[in-house]
């Protein structure tokens, strides 16, 4: 498919009613890169002789096929580089516009709810009218965000800050132009097998274990209420188990030695109040400890793969790969046979590069996303690992 150019003032419906300013007719490269819960960008090159070369500007939009399955997607142009022999155009998926819609006050009302209901309730906190719709197959209820989330964007409410929907609920984001879905799981188990030396061109296994742990030491800063005078203060709570242990085991870690992750759960314990009696005892100590343990165990369950395994990232030469892989999607699961000592592993497709002109994938990456647990530790683990 040839890319189509639209002016910067195109309405939401206008992208799907006509061909805008027309097709680029001297486009030599048009690639779409998408990562799981990550970037979704356009890299495009045209010749100076293209009919739209003197028309295209930053802030305009390009509509183009971004994978074999979805309708053509809209990308906003954010950079143009002009050289004598070529013009390079960079764009980002239309959903990035959610990052420009900023909250006028902390978008939190303290009530637990499902993702769909939270999305609807939170709209009143944002400055601009929101053209994006939202759906989710996740039906559990949680609280999101906190009073610390001042001037965050609508996009950050979805993913990108402590207490965001992805942070609290987990799941995988799927973007289809002006509709956003938070799915418990994106993709399916394809049953396709990739074998090193047969249809895998290279393999790379990260040697670092920076984000792999055997234990977690949860802690939180919570509210302490003195029942003698009704005064409240901040209290540093650390986990104390039934045998006075201060850590919780992370199952199935590949490490042969012990390594502890110290982790701050303050944002998930904001509703907890520890009550101190007139005798100096804690009235609800065990309930508070049980809550901290529950939050830690939920975290372990949600991020088990990243906490326990070294990621195996595999780049695939799709020219030599099974034709069936062209029908796979971001988030699908395949079987990798490394060919050494019978080692096999199931891995998700976490990154795709799609050639929109040829309408085929030219690169896929399998494995665990690198930007998950490490980024969250940087933001949330105030006590250090």
Describe the residue ranges of each PLM region.
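Solvent-exposed edge beta-strands and adjacent loop segments
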Residues: 1-37, 195-209
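Short beta-strand-centered interaction patches in the first periplasmic/extracellular domains
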Residues: 2, 9, 76-98, 136-225, ...
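Short conserved beta-strand and strand-loop elements enriched in small hydrophobics
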Residues: 5, 58-68, 331-339
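N-terminal export/assembly leaders
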Residues: 29-31, 37-41, 119-152, 305, ...
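Short, surface-exposed secondary-structure edge patches
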Residues: 49-55, 322-327
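Surface-exposed cap/loop segments at beta↔alpha junctions
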Residues: 51-138
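Acidic, low-complexity/disordered segments
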Residues: 89, 227-290, 294, 305, ...
């Amino acid at each position: 498919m040839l890319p189509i150019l639209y002016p910067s003032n195109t309405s939401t419906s206008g992208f799907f009613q006509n061909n805008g300013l027309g097709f680029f007719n001297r486009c030599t490269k048009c690639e779409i890169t998408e990562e799981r819960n990550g970037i979704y960008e356009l890299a495009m090159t045209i010749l100076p002789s293209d009919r739209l070369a003197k028309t295209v500007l930053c802030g305009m939009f390009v509509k183009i096929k971004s994978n074999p399955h979805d309708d053509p997607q809209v990308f906003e142009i954010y950079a143009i580089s002009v050289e004598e022999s070529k013009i390079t155009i960079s764009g980002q998926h239309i959903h990035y516009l959610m990052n420009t819609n900023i909250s006028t006050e902390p978008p939190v009302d303290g009530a637990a709810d499902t993702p769909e209901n939270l999305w609807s309730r939170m709209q009143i906190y944002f400055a601009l009218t929101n053209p994006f719709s939202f759906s989710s197959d996740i039906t559990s209820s949680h609280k999101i965000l906190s009073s610390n989330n001042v001037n965050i964007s609508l996009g950050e409410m979805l993913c990108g800050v402590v207490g965001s929907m992805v942070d609290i609920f987990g799941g995988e984001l799927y973007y289809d132009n002006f509709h956003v879905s938070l799915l418990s799981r994106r993709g399916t188990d394809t049953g396709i097998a990739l074998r090193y030396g047969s249809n895998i061109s290279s393999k790379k296994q990260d040697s670092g274990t920076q984000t792999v742990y055997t234990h977690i030491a949860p802690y939180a800063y919570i509210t302490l209420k003195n029942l003698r005078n009704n005064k409240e203060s901040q209290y540093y709570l650390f986990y104390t188990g039934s045998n006075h242990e201060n850590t919780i085991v992370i199952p199935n870690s590949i490490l042969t030695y012990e390594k502890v992750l110290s982790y701050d759960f303050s944002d998930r314990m904001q509703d907890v109040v520890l009550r101190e009696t007139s005798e100096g005892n804690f009235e609800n100590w065990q309930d508070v400890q049980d809550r901290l343990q529950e939050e830690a165990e939920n975290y372990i369950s949600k991020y088990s793969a990243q906490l326990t395994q070294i990621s195996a990232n595999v780049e695939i030469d799709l020219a030599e790969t099974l034709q069936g892989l062209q029908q796979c999607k971001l988030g699908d699961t395949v079987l990798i046979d490394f060919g050494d000592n019978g080692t096999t592993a199931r891995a998700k497709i976490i990154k795709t590069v799609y050639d929109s002109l040829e309408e085929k994938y030219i690169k896929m990456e399998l494995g665990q996303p690198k930007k998950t647990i490490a980024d969250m530790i940087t933001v949330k683990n105030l006590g250090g690992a």
